[in-house]
Amino acid sequence: MSDPFEALKAEVDLLGRLLGEAIRKVSGERFFALVEEVRLLSKARRQGDGAAAEVLSQRVERMPVEEMEALVRAFTHYFHLVNLAEERHRVRVNRLRTEGETLENPRPEGFLALAKALKERGLSLEEAEAHLNRLALLLTFTAHPTETRRRTLRHHLERLQEELEGGDRERLLARVVLLYATEEVRKARPSVEDEIKGGLYYLPTTLWRAIPKVVEGLEAALERVYGKRPHLRSPVRFRSWMGGDRDGNPYVTPEVTAFAGRYAREVAKGRYLEELEALVRDLSLSEARIPVPKEVREGGEGVERFPGEPYRRYFAALYRALEGEALSTEGLARALKVAEKGLEGVGLAQVAQAFLRPLEARLSAFGLELAPLDLREESGKLLEAAAELLRLGGVHPDFLALSPEEKEALLTEELKTARPLLPVGEVPQGEALRVALGALRAWGDKGAHVVSMTHHPADLLAVFLLAREVGLYRPGKPLPFDVVPLFETLEDLERAPEVLRRLLANPVFRAHAQGRGGVEVMIGYSDSNKDAGFLMANLALYQAQEALHAVGEAQGIPVFFFHGRGTSTARGGGPAGRAIAGLPPKSVGHRLRLTEQGEALADRYAHPDLAVRHLEQLLYHFAQAALGDGVEPKAHWREALGEAGERSMARYRALLSQEGFFPFFEAFTPIREIGELPIASRPVYRHGRVRDIRDLRAIPWVMAWTQVRLLLPGWYGLSALEGLPMPLLREMYREWPFFATTLESAAMALAKADLGIAERYLKLVPEGLQGFYHHLAEEYRRTVALLEAIFEAPLLHNQKTLERQIALRNPYVDPINFVQVELLARYRAPGGREDEGVRRALLLSLLGVAAGLRNAG
């Protein structure tokens, strides 16, 4: 097999030349010469030419802002094209590896490898089928500022992908010209409606095509290993937070929540109608040729067209029912099963497999909702809403003044009755109650209600009280949706087992959990990292899962985990399959939830084949973890890592609390500018307060460090491991998947960081604060040396593709950083914030670095 990376480089070269021609056509020869000059200087700097950096810096300092904006746009478009070429490269490599696998030598982390592992573990085909059909991998799509591409750009990139297949150079050039001449910056901050439409984009497109391939791939793999084909439904389902996540986002109103559910249902309905229309066209089976079951005949009786073609009539009737909103997910699933059995009963199983099974797979993955919507609200807002409701109902005048225990007791007593509290005709004056009740009424109750910043059982019982008010709760019965505590900070993670113990002892919540078949618990990777630092956050999350699982086991109620991961290393990013392998043994039940957000959506789902491979890797690890497989950590590993974690957290917190660090952070990084420019709908600071780092949201905290190429949240504090013996560290790395995953995630962040670029931002920092940077640079070097000693190899020793990708991209990200430093200086100068040209160019630079690094926050 020829080196696929050579094909990637050839395609990158082609697209680069086409972009050069587009720049000439749209912006002229003089500007093209400038782009080339900057590109060559950047390349020379990378190759060790020290003078090139200063020449480039001086060149940028003299540029008019219009030229800077155009330069950033040019290099950002290069990344869009490189990302496209990389996606195509990964598709080619995936196909080659799949074609080359054999039963004796299956592809790592693939369906065939999974089927073999299940058989080697002693599962019969029936047991393997039952196990896989029980699995529920829920992928939850969330909107975040890291997905920086407009839908118009996505459209051009998708068409470009098709034109690359055709190989017509003139059409390729025309498409690249269109791409280059398209405005990529939003004129205003995106609305939540924009985020909903953009965030759901991949569900009815690439994932719609991918899901049947996932089910087909699993079934075919089991058939190869066991000799008989099973009947599987999709183990993958989807959820959405877009339009339901009200935590700190004042723009998510009840009207937006209603729009989100309605939009997703309309999109799904359109796709299902297309599928049914295709079945009407395709299933032209004549009743004169084959026997037809009674149910199929009767199902199509109301249709006058297609005499003698009962299957066409049957699916035409289903089309009409769905169009008229007279069909549920369950009803459509039953109807498809009737048709499938009818075909199989007359020896036409192949027809059912080819034409009906793909639709059944989609229905089991998406339902008619496409991605049921979750609600998320902060506990304080829910308690505030409950307090007004209790006051208006004459139950208690000042609920918020009660202790947590008193709140729980009062709510438990109140929830024994079914009476609503709001007097007839009374309109709530408080915004918290009005919004909470409005959202519950607007919501389709198909997802879950997540309570962020959960501290006490009363935080969740408030949801029951509010749900009762809109007719969703009856005493002693479970709610029709999960109520999910979210534990985020280190303190909350440590307190989580006790909170869960008290929840499961509470009669209201226990009856609910039993009725729902278990309790879902969400753990947050973002705030815990910002709170405790990288190493301690990872350790605390691991320990919390062990303890929460033990509480559920002791109470006889399953605990299912919802992992609130981001795309960056600091927020639990990295290869998601390996992360599942690193979870505590026995903590993974048959249901697992993960967030999917930011540019992870484009990275994983831009092409159906990439989507299939990503889901294949997740399912490979999830299916085995759900059987209780995993490495139980040795006692001395726990002790050693516990001590190192404490030291790491102490160092991290000492840095953040040191006088002058917050002013250094605001000067060194573009954090203020991220908040001021139209990147995302959610405010950067919680509650609008700006006192210190605690008021800052986790995503912009990570994004700011990524922009300056230091990626501090993804590695800082790891040098605390230096206190442990090297043989012990190497043993833990070799034998403990959790520890290996943690270190390899940090290695990714360290490899993407660049001190040479980070140092350019020092010109923005007052001299008295520059010592912070020198400390961080020294910590960076120490941490790299430590990890390479543990690995006994370079940082990316087992991630060669990523290593080559970084080398390919860096010379083109660097110029954007050079420009960004100068733009920040101009923006912060008197009058700079009013300069629209500087604002636009700066926003473009933020988006450009995000496009170049691919996991901005």
Curated annotation (Swiss-Prot):
The active site is at H144, K530. The keyword Lyase applies. SUPFAM superfamilies: Phosphoenolpyruvate/pyruvate domain (SSF51621). It catalyses: oxaloacetate + phosphate = phosphoenolpyruvate + hydrogencarbonate. GO terms for biological process: carbon fixation; oxaloacetate metabolic process; tricarboxylic acid cycle. GO terms for cellular component: cytosol. GO terms for molecular function: magnesium ion binding; phosphoenolpyruvate carboxylase activity. Belongs to the PEPCase type 1 family. This is Phosphoenolpyruvate carboxylase. It comes from Thermus sp. (strain 71).
